[in-house]
Amino acid sequence: MNNGKPQTLAGSGGLTISDREFTQLRDLIHRRFGINLTDQKRSLLVGRLQKLMRNLNLSTFSDYYEYLTADKTEASLGELVDLVSTNHTYFNREKDHFDYFYQTALPAVITRLKQERRKDLRIWCAGCSTGEEPYTLLMLMMEYLGKDYVNWDAGILATDISDRALSIARRGAYPTDRVMQLPEHLRRKYFAAAGADGMAVIDQVKREATFRRFNLMNAVFPFKKPFQMIFCRNVMIYFDQPTRDALVQRFHQSTEAGGYLFIGHSETLGRSQTLYRYVKPALYQKGA
């Protein structure tokens, strides 16, 4: 109980954050990245920023806020989002999605494109983190299309707000335990040994992934053509409902008729949304 007095929270390194300072940073993070930091995340924010602030010789969170807002290059904002965002993932996470992609969604899209005499297979991984999701999808596309893959304008656009995550994704090298969830035949075919305890995605797969830094809070998505499938899994859990609703609206505008939106199994678009048709948990389809 605070009796109406401003509160401060001290981190293990001695830095303290006041109500006003936390509100300033929380509002900035929400405004720029859509991430909704609740009061329960206050100690997390303090803990993750302490080392960075010491390295910058900043003694208060007000000084850090001024540093952020004065940086016109926005590099400091990139550092901030790297620290507050979570990049925990692994290959074949939420396997049901990949099974549906390979067995149902991809065949349906390929059949429709052939009927329309098109060869442009457009898939976007929004919030791709360290690259496991787009690489898994590419392997499945190559498996499904076989030798015919080279005749398609395929590949995957993979975007994230974190430069640190994108750097790992572009390298395509992972600890072996992160890869073990994949079926053995995919590991054997699409990976090579990397160091004493690592595996690297082969170049044939890596060159089919286009990794870009992109902020999902952009008011307008700059894509010239819509996508047949959008994967945005375990991203919207960090957003409040108005932010989610606005993002889903932009996703819908960027989805082809009949296209799919995959979200995380802990997420839902809610019963009130009418843009997409519900297919199964965490999977939606745009009307034809």
PLM regions with names:
Residues 2-122, 264:
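Conserved AdoMet
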Residues 245-257:
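A short glycine-rich, Lys/Arg-flanked "PGG" loop and its adjoining helix->strand segment in the class I
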Residues 130-149:
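Conserved SAM-binding loop of SAM-dependent methyltransferases across substrates and taxa
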Residues 257-265:
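Conserved beta-strand signature within the Rossmann-like core of class I S-adenosyl-L-methionine
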Residues 126, 147-231, 235-246, 268-270, ...:
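Extended basic-aromatic, gly/pro-enriched interface segments that bind polyanionic ligands
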Residues 267-288:
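Class I S-adenosyl-L-methionine
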Residues 118-131, 157:
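Conserved class I S-adenosyl-L-methionine
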